[in-house]
Amino acid sequence: MGNIFGRWPGARKAIEDLHNTSSEPVGQASQDLQNKGGLTTNTLGTSADVLEYSADHTEEEVGFPVRPAVPMRPMTEKLAIDLSWFLKEKGGLDGLFFSPKRAAILDTWMYNTQGVFPDWQNYTPGPGIRYPLCRGWLFKLVPVDPPEDDEKNILLHPACSHGTTDPDGETLIWRFDSSLARRHIARERYPEYFK
């Protein structure tokens, strides 16, 4: 990992002291990779989906010029925390309207630069605040009031084209919440997802 996300030794040490347990992978491919050391026959569809996902997203305008420089791996708690703080410091996601396309861009970037399976960015169901299922990911989805329907917002505001894809009809934004590093709220509220 090195200096990819920068150094913040005090915060990192405090977080590591709080979490001496390893995180559990969320997706089936990540679970098989951690438990069995590779993809098994029951995840062949998943690995094909990963390859198809990568092929679909590298041909778009948002594509990336390189294939993964590291072996494929599941998202770990440390990597998720480092990525969250990196995106917060660089002004990445905090306050942006959530859309599946933006989430796919982030998944594709992580797949191509870090070799992380694109199954890590999942959230609890709505309505209301959606908490990340991946331990260490410090961005939750918070519902906001949709902007006013004046001509300027219809033409320019990203919520008009991205906020309508939520099954509950809510407009969601990413919010950074450092308390998610200390407490896994998704596991507390939805233990059935972690059996």
Curated annotation (Swiss-Prot):
Residues 7-22 are annotated as: Necessary for MHC-I internalization. It is found in: Host cell membrane; Host cytoplasm, Host perinuclear region; Virion; Secreted. Residues 2-53 are annotated as: N-terminal. Residues 144-171 are annotated as: Binding to ATP6V1H. A motif (PxxP) lies at residues 68-71. Residues 104-120 are annotated as: Mediates dimerization. Keywords: Apoptosis, Early protein, Host cell membrane, Host cytoplasm, Host membrane, Host-virus interaction, Lipoprotein, Membrane, Myristate, Phosphoprotein, Secreted, SH3-binding, Viral immunoevasion, Virion, Virulence. The keyword Endoplasmic reticulum does not apply. It is a lipid-anchor. Residues 59-61 are annotated as: Acidic. A lipid is attached at residue 2 (N-myristoyl glycine). GO terms for molecular function: GTP binding; SH3 domain binding. One of its GO terms (cellular component) is host cell perinuclear region of cytoplasm. InterPro entries: HIV-1_Nef_core_sf, HIV_Nef. The N-terminal domain is composed of the N-myristoyl glycine and of a cluster of positively charged amino acids. It is required for inner plasma membrane targeting of Nef and virion incorporation, and thereby for infectivity. This domain is also involved in binding to p53. Factor of infectivity and pathogenicity, required for optimal virus replication. Alters numerous pathways of T-lymphocyte function and down-regulates immunity surface molecules in order to evade host defense and increase viral infectivity. Alters the functionality of other immunity cells, like dendritic cells, monocytes/macrophages and NK cells. One of the earliest and most abundantly expressed viral proteins. This is Protein Nef. It comes from Simian immunodeficiency virus (isolate TAN1).
